[in-house]
Design a protein with these regions (language model features):
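Structural detector for short beta-strands of small beta-barrel domains
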Residues: 1-17
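Short, acidic/hydrophobic/Gly-rich beta-strand patch recurrent on exposed beta strands
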Residues: 23-28
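Short nucleic-acid-contacting surface segments enriched for D/E, G, S/T with interspersed K/R
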Residues: 41-56
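OB-fold/S1-family single-stranded nucleic acid-binding modules
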Residues: 60-92
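Catalytic phosphate/metal-binding cores of nucleic-acid and nucleotide-processing enzymes, i.e., regions
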Residues: 15-17, 30-31, 55, 62-65, ...
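Short, structured beta-strand/loop micro-motifs enriched in basic residues and often containing a Trp
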Residues: 30-40
Length: 99
């Protein structure tokens, strides 16, 4: 199973019995569907305001028959500044232009 760097952001979604509604999704430009579920640490998500972008190590796995991004809850992560996010986004743009 291959882990790779993925930038995610938190948002408020539907509340379920399993969550407070604080969810995470991949940001655009990385080749993942924007509605793809991200399974990651609730403590990480709660540590910053809604809308924060995190750089995580994640892999694609199946959950309930659908692909999702999985990040082990004990993995390190980085809170991205706006400038760091722009740097990552420009790399995605460069690699998509090379295809």
């Amino acid at each position: 199973t291959h882990y790779r760097e993925v930038v995610i952001e938190t948002y408020l979604g539907a509340t379920t019995h399993a969550s407070s509604g604080l969810r995470a999704r991949p940001v655009p430009g990385q080749g993942y569907p924007l509605d793809m579920h991200v399974e990651c640490s609730m403590a990480m998500r709660r540590s910053q305001p809604v809308g924060t972008r995190f750089l995580i190590q994640a892999r694609v796995k199946a959950k309930d028959g659908r692909p999702c991004l999985y990040c082990y809850y004990g993995n390190d992560y980085k809170v991205l500044t706006d400038e760091e996010f722009r740097q990552h986004a420009s790399r995605w743009q460069s690699s998509s232009n090379e295809r």
